[in-house]
UniProtKB/Swiss-Prot annotation:
PANTHER family in the record: HOMER (PTHR10918)
Signal peptide: none
GO cellular component, one term: postsynaptic density
Basic and acidic residues: bias regions: 110-122
Keyword Transmembrane helix on entry: no
Region (Disordered): 110-166
Highest taxon listed in the record's lineage: Eukaryota
CDD domains: EVH1_Homer_Vesl
Role played: Postsynaptic density scaffolding protein. Binds and cross-links cytoplasmic regions of GRM1, GRM5, ITPR1, DNM3, RYR1, RYR2, SHANK1 and SHANK3. By physically linking GRM1 and GRM5 with ER-associated ITPR1 receptors, it aids the coupling of surface receptors to intracellular calcium release. May also couple GRM1 to PI3 kinase through its interaction with AGAP2. Isoforms can be differently regulated and may play an important role in maintaining the plasticity at glutamatergic synapses Required for normal hearing. Negatively regulates T cell activation by inhibiting the calcineurin-NFAT pathway.
Source organism of the structure: Mus musculus (Mouse)
Protein name from the UniProt record: Homer protein homolog 2
């Protein structure tokens, strides 16, 4: 691979669940670096992501691959060689757009690299065929010239065949030397890449240890802070209880203040009333004197009433006596009147007789 990445971003890496082919399985616990690399030895482009010492993405981009945006911050592509589907979750839509654009560029570059490789293969094949055709022609020309030359006429067909085979072996040897040189270069590149990867792995391991220590420190700090938070929450609970008590006390104080104001108003009214008490007492004494006089008058009146009752009883007795005498008188008078009527009738009868 190339020493420097073509493009680098950060994202959360996912892989499709191989059993269900539907659910996403997180391949990284947090956002990791995802980079495009150009592999010089293989003339190919790759997407590589490493989480600590673990390679979670090593996908070779082919011209028939497609990167699909499934949401504003999530995209995926299928890798048939790895027999899986990779998914990337970005922190913003802009990062997803840049990654998708770079995917299109790299895919087009991979297509061009494949086309060039095919052209070179076809050119090399044609060149080999032309070289193979030229050798029999030269042999045939030598054979023709040999008919004219008496010395050449003595050359056997086996020598001609050996010469042709030697030419072919020279060409193959040249190509083999070139391939060996190319393979040595590729091997050296791979060694350098392995060395860089080993260094990166060692650095990653050291970084992991450092992160572990940092994580342990952070965990201890987190535990301490959690304990502190619990203490503060307990203190807050006590403060809230105290606030509630203070609120109740404030309400009680307000009620007592209201009662005090009412009592002060009552006291003020009583003071006003106490100012008129002497006047009321004098009036009360005056009324008491009048009441005593009225009681004396009432006693006198009662005495008079008793005297009048006695007089009335005597008067009633006299009236009853007079009524009896009057009744006797009226009875006598009625008798006298009856006698007078009889006398008058007698006189009338005497007058009639006369």
């Amino acid at each position: 691979m190339g020493e420097q990445p073509i493009f680098t971003t950060r994202a959360h890496v996912f892989q499709i669940d191989p059993s269900t082919k539907k659910n996403w399985v997180p391949a990284s616990k947090q956002a990791v670096t995802v980079s495009y690399f150009y592999d010089v030895t293989r003339n190919s482009y790759r997407i590589i992501s490493v989480d600590g010492a673990k390679v979670i993405i090593n996908s070779t981009i082919t011209p028939n691959m497609t990167f699909t945006k499934t949401s504003q911050k999530f995209g995926q592509w299928a890798d048939s060689r790895a027999n899986t589907v990779f998914g990337l979750g970005f922190s913003s839509e802009l990062q997803l757009t840049k990654f998708a654009e770079k995917f299109q560029e790299v895919r087009e570059a991979a297509r061009l690299a494949r086309d060039k490789s095919q052209e070179k293969t076809e050119t090399s094949s044609n060149h080999s065929q032309e070289s193979g055709c030229e050798t029999p022609s030269s042999t045939q020309a030598s054979s023709v010239n040999g008919t004219d030359d008496e010395k050449a006429s003595h050359a056997s067909p086996a020598d001609t065949h050996l010469k042709s085979e030697n030419d072919k072996l020279k060409i193959a040897l040249t190509q083999s030397a070139a391939n060996v040189k190319k393979w040595e270069m590729e091997l050296q590149t791979l060694r350098e890449s392995n060395a860089r990867l080993t260094t990166a792995l060692q650095e990653s391991a050291a970084s992991v240890e450092q992160w572990k220590r940092q994580f342990s420190i952070c965990r201890d700090e987190n535990d301490r802070l959690r304990s502190k938070i619990e203490e503060l929450e307990e203190q807050c609970s006590e403060i809230n209880r105290e606030k509630e008590k203070n609120t109740q006390l404030k309400r009680r104080i307000e009620e007592l203040e209201s009662e005090v104001r009412d009592k002060e108003m009552e006291l003020k009214d009583l003071r006003k009333q106490s100012e008129i008490i002497p006047q009321l007492m004098s009036e009360c004494e005056y009324v008491s004197e009048k009441l005593e006089a009225a009681e004396r008058d009432n006693q006198n009146l009662e005495d008079k009433v008793r005297s009048l009752k006695t007089d009335i009883e005597e008067s009633k007795y006299r009236q009853r006596h007079l009524k009896g005498e009057l009744k006797s008188f009226l009875e006598v008078l009625d008798g006298k009147i009856d006698d007078l009527h009889d006398f008058r009738r007698g006189l009338s009868k005497l007058g009639t007789d006369n």
